[in-house]
Amino acid sequence: MAIPVVGLTGGIGSGKSAAADRFAELGVPVIDTDSIAHQLTGPGGAAMTEIVRVFGPGVVAGDGSLDRAAMRARVFAAPEERKRLEAILHPAIHAESVRRLQAAVGDYAVLVVPLLFESDRYAPLLARALVVDCSEEVQVERVMRRSKLSADAVRAIMAAQLPRSERLRRADDVIDNSGGLAELRLQVDAKHSYYLANLVKAML
């Protein structure tokens, strides 16, 4: 990469998006793989032709985007379908992430990858891995508050992700988001100063 890249991750409800938003406010280029995935599967998205070829027109919404409810039902009924979908999306998301990182202008960039440690695909791109962390109880509470999911449903999603202890073990840097937004922003500001002083200096 032309500039250093910080990989930003964390469990569901940890506050990844709020942290990414603050980095963006500080002028850091932020590339979000979830956003890329939505663009690839939106109306006219680059992945839709292959998705239709593999899964048929039944997974396409009226506007030409991926019908997420229909795809979720397919994946739930037959787990091997998830692998077929991932085989289409993951390489495309990675390629677009690399393209955007190479075009990024700034002292360093942040790459938001919810499942950063579940795959080794992104590791070669990164100078640092930053985990936004909070207790599992706080995760459940936050996700329930912002969605209609039950506590059991949230815990099922968490169980499919890397355990919190393993994320923390693999992190280079950690932001503790057990408090409020103001505290999170202060921690992001501190990390930003650290990255400017260390990552950027290392590139000179």
UniProtKB/Swiss-Prot annotation:
Residues 5-204 form the DPCK domain. The keyword Lipoprotein does not apply. InterPro entries: Depp_CoAkinase, P-loop_NTPase. It is found in: Cytoplasm. It holds the Pfam family CoaE. GO terms for molecular function: ATP binding; dephospho-CoA kinase activity. ATP binds at G13, S14, G15, K16, S17, A18. Its main location: cytoplasm. Keywords: ATP-binding, Coenzyme A biosynthesis, Cytoplasm, Kinase, Nucleotide-binding, Transferase. GO terms for cellular component: cytoplasm. It catalyses: 3'-dephospho-CoA + ATP = ADP + CoA + H(+). One of its GO terms (biological process) is coenzyme A biosynthetic process. Pathway: Cofactor biosynthesis; coenzyme A biosynthesis; CoA from (R)-pantothenate: step 5/5. Its EC number is 2.7.1.24. PANTHER family: BIFUNCTIONAL COENZYME A SYNTHASE-RELATED (PTHR10695:SF46), DEPHOSPHO-COA KINASE-RELATED (PTHR10695). Catalyzes the phosphorylation of the 3'-hydroxyl group of dephosphocoenzyme A to form coenzyme A. NCBIfam families: dephospho-CoA kinase. Belongs to the CoaE family. This is Dephospho-CoA kinase. The lineage of its organism: Bacteria, Pseudomonadati, Pseudomonadota, Betaproteobacteria, Neisseriales.
